[in-house]
A protein has these predicted regions:
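N-acyltransferase acceptor-side catalytic subdomain
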Residues: 1-374
Length: 374
């Protein structure tokens, strides 16, 4: 069977229904999300993210794809390779540009070599390797891979890096109190105290699904979102128009939570969800209320998952405090191909040392699990 492998320069060059047929129930990987990033200039010319999606057709049908980008920096990736770039620079070599398969600004595990056919996944990998050779690129990277993509990259002898994120599992809880009943006494008590303090402060939280989000709600959320970046003295990755775009194109996948105090909005969090998983993505506050972050980013979302029968709440990277809120650690993987043999050897040695430390860290987190021991 013959395949036609194409490298597009825009998501407008692939039909949304064809792309989405490959990524069922993956809202952060759907055509609407990826094209919104491009259409609202979060990626593209001048951003350091140039989209080059790989498309594999068989008899005219899209049977494989990968969200490939050409990168000229390492911002917005969440698998950190700055030290590699610095080592290249010290040696008089260019680390950038590099190839990257990822969802921009989104550290979420999922399909990256998007196909259920191993031979098609192998073609995508080989296409990236050929692009590295043809354009004399330093490296290629595939971030936050699911099991299928990980296996294909392992078979192709790509270097693996390990990480840890936190996930909450909705174990058929009937309500939030049912969830709390499964926690150890001290964790249950702490959560109740935190929620009570927020309530006693007079805060009211409103959960708004995508179709009901008004322009003024988006305006307020974006003010909160940008304020978070300003507090960390950095620049927001996403434009205001991006949120308008996803609000219009994928409203069934969006949950906005706004906190109000004395009739005024003071904080907001944005979640994106599918049938099986909810992803906590962005948060910001214009006024400080103790424990409001936990209420808005964790407890409200957990209640929503229980009410909507959503199985997983992906809490993302960092934040060991998530353990005390019912989250458990889960491993993450990324895969890397380094063209220079000397750097390939050195980075392999680095990754093996890093992996040993990550195993110890993961085991430590598991020992601190918040649930009752039967």
């Amino acid at each position: 069977m013959s395949f036609d492998i194409q490298i597009a320069t825009s998501y407008s060059q692939v039909k949304a229904q064809d792309w989405d047929a490959l990524v069922t129930d993956s809202p952060l990987l759907c055509h609407a999300f990826l094209s919104a990033l491009e259409e609202t200039k979060c990626v593209g010319e001048g951003t350091g993210w140039q989209p080059y999606p790989i498309l594999v057709y068989e008899l005219g049908k899209l049977v494989g794809a990968a969200p490939l980008y050409l990168k000229v920096h390492s911002y917005g990736e969440y698998v950190f390779d700055w030290s590699w770039a610095e080592a290249y620079e010290r040696s008089g070599l260019n680390y950038y540009p590099k190839l990257l398969v990822a969802i921009p600004f989104t550290p979420i595990t999922g399909a990256r070599l998007i196909s259920n056919k191993p031979d098609v996944q192998a073609m995508i990998i080989r296409t990236m390797e050929l692009q590295m050779q043809q354009y004399d690129l330093s490296s290629a990277h595939v971030l936050f891979t699911d099991e299928s993509s990980s296996e294909a990259l392992k078979v192709s002898n790509w270097l693996r890096r390990d990480g840890v994120q936190f996930r909450w599992h909705n174990d058929h809880f009937s309500d939030f109190d049912d969830f709390l009943s499964h926690l150890s006494h001290d964790k249950r008590k702490k959560i109740k105290q935190e929620r009570k303090k927020v309530t006693n402060a007079g805060v009211i939280c409103k959960r708004i699904k995508g179709a009901d989000i008004r322009p003024q709600d988006w305006d307020f959320f974006y003010e909160c979102y940008t304020n978070t970046y300003l507090e960390h003295r950095s620049t927001p990755y996403l434009t205001r128009s991006f949120f308008d775009e996803i609000g219009t194109s994928m409203p069934k996948n969006i949950l906005l939570i706004i906190a109000e105090l004395d009739g005024r909005s003071i904080a907001a969090s944005l979640n994106i969800y599918g049938q099986q998983s909810l992803y906590g993505r962005y948060w910001g506050a214009l006024e400080y209320v103790p424990n409001l972050h936990f209420e808005l980013c964790y407890y409200q979302a957990q209640e929503f998952c229980i009410a909507e029968n959503i199985k997983y709440f992906e809490g993302g990277a960092q934040g060991e405090h998530k353990l005390a809120r019912g989250f458990l650690p889960r491993p993450t993987f990324s895969y890397h191909k380094i063209a220079n043999p000397d750097f390939d050897k050195a980075i392999n040695e680095f990754a093996h040392r890093e992996a040993s430390g990550m195993v110890a860290y993961y085991n430590e987190l598991e020992e601190r699990a918040p649930f009752k021991i039967n």
